[in-house]
From Swiss-Prot:
Domain of life: Archaea
Protein's recorded name: Uncharacterized protein MJ1455
InterPro entries: Xyl_isomerase-like_sf
Length: 305
């Protein structure tokens, strides 16, 4: 048992190094799934990934699902992800096409025809004019479940911050940062928990950005140099994780750091430490240890002596 499984994206060449650092999950990057590589690459990823990690995820290529060519690219990527041993396929929904709910439900049906054991995990909208508010994700996930498609929301936290707090339209990161307090995050986590039957799938990188014309331009930045603020987010994550582990109905939680390649391991370990430090007092509280009943009372009195 562990509070959460943590890791980042890795090519085959860095799987061993990532495992030695203590990470427990790995994600196949989009570049691997968008290129034709020797079959031995995929087989080796599956073999080493299975030895070193508890779960393998895949991040789909940045192909537009609104075009036939883009859809075919995703179907090919799912085949490659399957060869790599991936259990979860994370992907972007992309721009609105009209009748989006039904359109993306049909896309998921085609995904499932390739691999109906894969868990599909659509991300929230990443820019202006894209499909994927939290309301829309809820509708899509409920509809897909009715078709017996395995699906969970991909909680890319900075996208939720930008989209749900209107940054794409207002271009005011500081105003949004003031609203993104612990309670705001917890409401989102608990809401998404209700539709995440298998796993809670968190993803995160800080970003900066600005609106220009009809588009919001953003880029990832090192931890501590962007938005959303880390302090309330990590406090909310620690609270959710401890509640999930100690209040019954334990659910597996994955956390994927999606930051810049050159700092991703350092940032991931810093972020992991922040969350775990905030979790210590919550885990060691008497409320969290109430399950031990009279035994806890005896041990407490002995410790006080």
């Amino acid at each position: 048992m562990i509070l959460f499984e943590w890791g980042t994206y890795n090519a085959l060449s860095t799987l061993k190094q990532a495992a030695l650092l203590g990470t427990r999950i790995t994600e196949i990057p989009p570049a691997v799934l968008s290129r034709r590589l020797p079959s031995g690459y995929y087989e080796s990823y599956k073999k080493l990934g299975g030895e070193y990690f508890t779960s393998i995820l895949a991040h789909g290529p940045y192909y537009s699902l609104s075009s036939e060519k883009g859809l075919k690219g995703h179907l090919s990527a799912i085949e490659k992800a399957t060869l790599c041993g991936a259990e979860i396929y994370n992907y972007h929904l992309g721009k609105r096409v009209g009748d989006d709910l039904n359109y993306h439900l049909e896309v998921l049906k085609k995904f499932s025809e390739v691999n109906n054991e894969m868990i599909y995990s659509p991300e929230p909208a990443t820019n202006i004019g894209e499909f994927g508010t939290l309301d829309e994700l809820e509708e899509l996930i409920k509809a897909a479940k009715e078709e017996d498609i395995k699906i969970i929301p991909s909680l890319q936290l900075e996208n939720i911050f930008l989209n749900e707090l209107g940054v794409y339209e207002k271009d005011d990161l500081d105003e949004a940062a003031e609203k993104a307090d612990v309670d705001w995050w917890l409401k989102i986590f608990r809401r998404m928990d209700k539709i995440s039957d298998y796993i809670m799938h968190f993803r995160f990188s800080q970003v900066i950005g600005l609106k220009y014309g009809k588009r919001f331009y953003k880029k990832r930045v090192p931890l501590g140099k962007g938005y959303p603020p880390v302090e309330p987010l990590t406090e909310a994550l620690a609270t959710y994780l401890v509640d999930n582990a100690t209040r019954g109905g334990f659910k597996k939680v994955l956390f994927v750091y999606t930051g810049l390649p050159e700092v991703k391991y350092r940032d991931l370990i810093d972020l992991y430490a922040m969350i775990m430090k905030k979790s210590i007092d919550k885990l060691m509280s008497r409320e969290s240890q109430v399950e031990y009943g009279d035994f806890y009372k005896v041990m407490s009195s002995e410790e006080e002596e």
